[in-house]
């Protein structure tokens, strides 16, 4: 639920390495 400051419209979340995942075109961490 916390925004990771990254979008994932065209590319995946690079912040995935710190448990961030794509949701509604924005990367979130829980």
UniProtKB/Swiss-Prot annotation:
Disulfide topology: 4-20, 8-22, 13-27
TM annotation in the entry: none
Tissue expression profile of the protein: Detected in stems (at protein level).
Cyclopeptide (Gly-Asn), cross-linked positions: 1-30
Post-translational modification: This is a cyclic peptide.
GO biological process, any: defense response
Keyword Disulfide bond in annotation: yes
Domain of life: Eukaryota
One family name in Pfam for this protein: Cyclotide
InterPro entries per the UniProt record, alphabetical: Cyclotide, Cyclotide_bracelet_CS, Cyclotide_sf
Keywords: Disulfide bond, Knottin, Plant defense
Family label: Belongs to the cyclotide family. Bracelet subfamily.
Protein purpose: Probably participates in a plant defense mechanism. Has cytotoxic activity against HUVEC cells (LC(50)= 2.17 uM) and various cancer cells including HeLa (LC(50)= 3.05 uM), MCF-7 and K562. Displays very weak hemolytic activity. Binds to and induces leakage in phospholipd membranes, particularly ones containing 1-palmitoyl-2-oleophosphatidylethanolamine (POPE).
Domain remark in the UniProt entry: The presence of a 'disulfide through disulfide knot' structurally defines this protein as a knottin.
Protein name listed in UniProt: Cyclotide hyen-E
């Amino acid at each position: 639920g916390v925004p990771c400051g990254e979008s994932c419209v065209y590319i995946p979340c690079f912040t995935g390495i710190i448990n961030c995942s794509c949701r509604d075109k924005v990367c979130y961490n829980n």
